[in-house]
Structure formats: structure tokens, C-alpha cells
């Protein structure tokens, strides 16, 4: 069962790889040196075959995924999740970022002064 779960998780990446390979194969078959290029209508037919085959392969997976994740698209659930996430993580992001930047600057300056020879970095007060 674990193998099936992993294979379902890898399905989108696999579909993308198949699409890329199909496009590369279609492009390479047209790019052989020394062979005349097929007429434009044949190129269009090849590409339409690739598109229709990919649609045929991917449409059931996309439909199943959409049906499984339909609850996520319910606006009230999604809105509640986003509001909670904002309240928990993003509300005070500005002040936290400013504090972190100031602390980082101070730490970096302290490290720089500690590495600097005393003759070059002494205060001239």
C-alpha cells in the first residue's frame, strides 16, 4: 500500500516528465539533419496527436485530483485557513523583520571589528 501511495504522489511529476519527453521527441524527429522537413500540415498533425494523447492521459488524473481536493476550494474553509495562518505567522512580520535586520547588522559589525587588526579599526575619539 505504501508503494501505491508514493506512486500517486509522484504522478504529477511523472506526467510532467512524459509531457517534456513527448515534446522533445516531437521536436527531435523534425530536426534530423539531411532530411527535408515535413509539410506544415503534417507538423500540425503530429503536434495535435501529442496534445490529444497527453490530454487523454492527464485528464482523468486531473479530474480525480480536483474531485479529491474539492473540499479545499470551499471558500469559507480556505478563508478561515488563510486568516488563521496570517494571524499566527504574518501579522507581526514587519516588526520582526526589522528587529532581525538590526540584530544581524549589529552581529555582523561586531564580527567584523573582532577580525580587524587593532591598528586599523581603533576609534579615533
Curated annotation (Swiss-Prot):
Biological processes annotated in GO: lipid transport; positive regulation of triglyceride storage; triglyceride homeostasis
Record's subcellular location: Secreted
Range of residues in the leader sequence: 1-27
Domain of life per record: Eukaryota
GO (cellular component) term, any one: very-low-density lipoprotein particle
Coiled-coil stretches: none
Alphabetized Pfam families for the sequence: APOC4
Keywords: Lipid transport, Secreted, Signal, Transport
Keyword 4Fe-4S: no
InterPro entries recorded: APOC4
Role played: May participate in lipoprotein metabolism.
Similarity comment: Belongs to the apolipoprotein C4 family.
Name of the protein in its database record: Apolipoprotein C-IV
Organism listed in the record: Ateles geoffroyi (Black-handed spider monkey)
Amino acid at each position: 500500500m505504501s508503494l501505491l501511495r508514493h506512486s500517486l504522489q509522484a504522478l504529477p511529476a511523472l506526467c510532467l516528465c512524459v509531457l517534456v519527453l513527448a515534446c522533445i521527441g516531437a521536436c527531435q524527429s523534425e530536426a534530423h539533419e539531411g532530411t527535408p522537413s515535413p509539410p506544415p500540415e503534417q507538423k500540425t498533425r503530429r503536434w495535435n496527436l501529442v496534445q490529444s494523447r497527453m490530454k487523454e492521459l492527464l485528464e482523468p488524473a486531473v479530474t480525480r485530483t480536483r474531485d479529491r481536493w474539492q473540499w479545499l476550494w470551499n471558500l469559507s474553509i480556505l478563508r478561515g485557513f488563510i486568516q488563521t495562518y496570517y494571524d499566527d505567522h504574518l501579522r507581526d512580520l514587519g516588526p520582526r523583520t526589522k528587529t532581525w535586520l538590526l540584530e544581524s547588522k549589529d552581529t555582523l559589525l561586531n564580527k567584523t571589528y573582532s577580525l580587524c587588526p587593532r591598528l586599523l579599526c581603533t576609534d579615533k575619539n
